[in-house]
Amino acid sequence: MTEPLKILVVEDEALILMQIEMMLEEAGHCVVGTAMTAREAIALVHETRPELVLIDLRLGDGSSGLDVAQAVRDLGGITAAFMTANAQALSEDMAGATAVIAKPFTGTVLEESLTYLEDCVRRPPPTESVPPGMRVAPAWLASFAQMRAGSTPRQGPRRS
């Protein structure tokens, strides 16, 4: 088995947060932190340096997962993915996140999405096709295509 991904989970609903945390740990990953607000999440990103941040788009305290994604993007070197039932609310660039996982999702959908995201983090470009229930940002798909063609280093799209 490969080394577990270090994952930070940002979700404002406690029961959903616990369920996601349990699913991640059962899949063999390491949850390095959980946050229910953007402020907590941004502090934990700096403190824990996760490899992957799973972010709910709408947070209950009035903050937005977009704020978290922007902080992750600014820090660099960390992959972000949204989890939301409202994927159409995201702009095409997904605020710099790699992907969005549609809620509600099953354990299978989450596990397949994590396999894809693990390849994004550790072995880009992913060799698997995008799993059902997940949408990848067009800039990331283009970057992966360039990597496969050998015309770009193995990293995601340039951050502006």
Q: Whereabouts are the PLM-identified features?
A:
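A Lys-centered signature of the CheY-like receiver
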Residues: 103
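Conserved acidic carboxylate
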Residues: 11
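Hydrophobic/aromatic residues positioned on beta-strands within the core alpha/beta folds
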Residues: 83-84
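CheY-like receiver
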Residues: 112-115, 119-160
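Short amphipathic alpha-helix used as the core "switch/output" element in two-component signaling
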Residues: 63-78
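Acidic, metal-coordinating helix/loop segments flanking the phosphotransfer/catalytic sites
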Residues: 21, 34-52
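Two-component/phosphorelay signaling modules centered on CheY-like receiver
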Residues: 14-33
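Active-site residues of response regulator receiver
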Residues: 56-57
